[in-house]
Amino acid sequence: MPRDNRLYSGFVNHDYILTFSIADEANRARLVALCAGPWQGDEVTPDTWEVSNTLSPDQMERAILELMGDADRAAYYYLSDSKRMFRVLLG
């Protein structure tokens, strides 16, 4: 089976730990608004959130990348179907 470079998870809701450093205040505010709103997140620190949503890991990554500049950094952690924790570094 050829690899398609997608991150799969069979869970209906996905739980993530997201930590980020985004310099642009508008983009940072948009990410915080996503975490607090539709992503159903709980603030751990101003730059770290626990979120639970229906986005797949690929969709989550694309949504975060859209808000990041060249010097920004983000990492998220998620649990896979096999109960393994994965860390994805962005930026």
What is each stretch, according to the model?
Residues 2-7, 88-90:
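Short, solvent-exposed beta-alpha or beta-beta edge segments that form flexible loop/patches at the rim
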Residues 6-22:
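Short glycine-/aliphatic-rich beta-strand segments at the starts of folded cytosolic domains
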Residues 38-82, 86-87:
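Short, intrinsically disordered low-complexity segments
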Residues 7, 18, 27-30, 50, ...:
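Low-complexity, compositionally biased segments
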Residues 1, 9, 13, 69-71, ...:
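Short linear sequence motifs
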